[in-house]
Amino acid sequence: MFITFEGIEGSGKSTALARLKDWLQEHGHGATLTREPGGSRLGGILRSILLDIGNDDLTGETELFLYLADRSQHVHQVIRPALAEGVAVISDRYADSTVVYQGYGRGLDPALLHRLNDVAVRGLWPDLTLLFDLEPEIGLKRATTRNLREGTGATEGRFEAESLAFHTRVREGYLTWAALNKERFRIIDAAASPDEVFEQVRSAVADVFTIG
């Protein structure tokens, strides 16, 4: 069982991730949480480069190859071994983020990015992808508030510092990409309350997998 969470900044993925892991474990399924970038040792180093607000001169192409390196190592060291042991893997972002952020957001070719992703992951695609959909203005406000509260604006806030126009392209890109990949995408209304959001998540997972 391989589930990925996608969405714009501040869409509430992290809270729902933890609740899904607990729910799966309560129903007898081993589960582990991971993230991109940063799910492996190398990924942690790359995350510090990619998200640091001081690195605002990175090109879309530079971002692309750093994310692909992170993803390849993540799949090899974390995701495949866990799946081989029968553990459910729940990842906060995966390959679709690159298609959307560097493709629809930065203007690179989404189809090319999908092919490069397939090389990086060696054909390992999620069984289910949950897209947390939210108006960019709301998401940015949430994310900025979180970074201020946690003191992570400088080290984790590079994408939050992008323009509203960029985040609007990202949101629209996610919806376009989800429509092109309907077989594994489910859209979550991330503007709902945390409990309502999790109920949508639980229902989507139960529709795809046999739980309990």
Curated annotation (Swiss-Prot):
**EC annotation?**
2.7.4.9
GO MF terms listed in the record are: ATP binding; dTMP kinase activity
Name the domain of life this protein comes from. Answer: Bacteria
Positions of ATP binding: 7-14
One GO CC annotation: cytosol
- Which GO biological process categories is it annotated with? dTDP biosynthetic process; dTTP biosynthetic process; dUDP biosynthetic process
Q: Which reaction does it catalyse?
A: dTMP + ATP = dTDP + ADP
Q: Which UniProt keywords apply?
A: ATP-binding, Kinase, Nucleotide biosynthesis, Nucleotide-binding, Transferase
The enzyme class is transferase
HAMAP family tied to this protein: Thymidylate_kinase
Job of this protein: Phosphorylation of dTMP to form dTDP in both de novo and salvage pathways of dTTP synthesis.
Family, per entry: Belongs to the thymidylate kinase family.
Know the name of this protein?
Thymidylate kinase
